[in-house]
């Protein structure tokens, strides 16, 4: 397997531990790629979720083991690197909070942006389930009440 691809999550590991382990694995893979590229790298889609300990959608037409690199415009898109898939997300330019620093040169799209990115790759049911997972993850990591996180998600949707 390519050294920059994520490993599949173990099926018998408790979810919180497996999310933590998957995030650490993702950070290592993403940091190695950023070092190889020699600069900051923004990750989106399922990679952004993995980096931030958000459960991945069960039914998604993207390969969750690939590293999904995101840029703001097509001309800024990274060249194709084995084990990666480049994407463009134009909202980066207009939403200053779209990029979340993870470690060193590794950045991830905010979970709301990753959710919106994934909207064309999952069913409506999966999108609702993913929104709930994101609300829970943000609530747990920030200490904010889930209703406040939901309100922030609604505001994001209204302003996107």
Language-model segments: residues:
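Short gly/ser-rich loop at a beta-strand->alpha-helix junction or flexible surface loop bordering the NTP-binding
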Residues: 1-160
């Amino acid at each position: 397997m390519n050294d920059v691809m994520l490993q599949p999550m173990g099926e018998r590991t408790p979810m919180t531990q497996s999310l933590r382990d998957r995030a650490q694995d993702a950070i290592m893979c993403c940091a190695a790629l950023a070092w190889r590229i020699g600069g900051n790298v923004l990750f989106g889609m399922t990679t952004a979720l993995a980096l931030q300990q958000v459960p991945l959608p069960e039914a998604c037409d993207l390969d969750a083991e690939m590293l999904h690199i995101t840029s703001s415009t097509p001309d800024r898109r990274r060249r194709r690197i084995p084990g990666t898939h480049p994407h463009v997300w134009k909202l980066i330019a207009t939403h200053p909070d779209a990029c979340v620093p993870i470690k060193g040169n590794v950045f991830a799209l905010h979970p709301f942006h990753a959710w919106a990115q994934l909207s064309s790759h999952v069913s409506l049911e999966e999108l609702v389930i993913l929104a709930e997972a994101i609300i829970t993850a943000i609530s747990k990591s920030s200490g904010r009440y889930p209703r406040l996180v939901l309100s922030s998600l609604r505001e994001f949707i209204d302003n996107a």
